[in-house]
Amino acid sequence: MPTCTRPAADFTPEQLRFPAIPGYTVRADFTGGELSSDLGAAILGAVDRRIGMIDRFTAAITDFRDVRYITHSLRDLLTQRIFQIACGYEDGNDANALRRDPMFKLAAARAPLATDNLLACGATQSRMENALRRSDLYRMAEALVLQFIAGYRSAPASITLDLDHTADTTHGQQELSFYNHHYGSYCYLPLLVFEASTGALVTAVLRPGKRPTGAENAMIMKRVLRLLRQHWPRTHILLRGDGHFSNPELMQLILDDGNADFIFGLTGNAVLARRAEGLMKNARGHLALHQAMHAQKRGPAVQAVRLFGEFEYAAKSWSQAHRVVFKAEVLASACRQTGGSNGAPNQPKSGG
């Protein structure tokens, strides 16, 4: 019986090339050998060698160790810890196993297959983290802002900064971990700042799990704005955030900048409810009309009516009045409104 055979083709495995480290060229192929499930660490290392984020963090921290007894440099410790977290290994004791991983060693610019150059163990990582002082953390937050600025070739005409306090649930006896009723757990409540159009991280500030005060918000953002203004004096800056940020201290800071504005959530109160009641009556009337027309088969069913309005408002603690935009919303289910039982409109927004 005749058979048909095809000549074997020459085959070269496709390779991935990475930036070299001293004394080594770095390539990845798929022919076996020493294995690792964390190629991402090597990719992160290659990216960092281009942008220099770990170098910024290293320069921000004061290392008080005696140089005669240092096995792992501060830069190596930060590289190992940060990349472990990025790859999903949050626990410090994960370092006990990953210190031998060739990809994590490669990320730290160490020979990946050597057996005499292990990375730091979990105990060393723990000592490093506990040695950090408040001033180190402050300078690391500054380093993030400088990294954000370095991502631009020239000063942008305008940027929008989104401010957000995000719950980070804690377990055990972590320092400054507090119970937060809103989130229903013990947590930290770090402040994260992102640039809205690109999603780029501007900075992150670790803080206790309690609700921030206006003075604290202003203190943090004063430092962020100062760094931005040193590099971008003419850039218009818009800050956005929820009701955590509608504090007189932060609002005044933004007004004093001269080329910045804000859009913040505003907690409802009796004064705002009275100012919005006229629009709420209109919303109820619109819904009643739609329901009547639907009952007569003269129109579609309407589940909600939403109307928007605005007015000038000044709380006693504010230095001036600001424009408040609010939503009056009435739902068809039980003809109830959202936002609370006191008749207040839903989530008014204040702007400067």
Which residues make up each language-model segment?
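An anionic, glycine-rich sequence signature occurring as long contiguous blocks
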Residues: 2-3, 12-26, 263-352
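Flexible, acidic glycine-rich loops studded with aromatic residues
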Residues: 105, 214, 227, 253, ...
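Hydrophobic "anchor" residues on beta-strands that sit immediately upstream
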Residues: 160, 236-238, 261
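Dynamic "connector" segments at or just before major functional cores
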Residues: 1-212, 216-231, 256
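Acidic/histidine-rich, metal-coordinating catalytic segments
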Residues: 164, 235-246
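Short, surface-exposed basic-aromatic patches at helix termini and helix-loop junctions that form
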Residues: 251-260
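A short acidic (Asp/Glu
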Residues: 172, 247-252, 273-277
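Active-site beta-loop-alpha junctions enriched in small/polar residues
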Residues: 166-168, 207-209, 244-246, 267-271
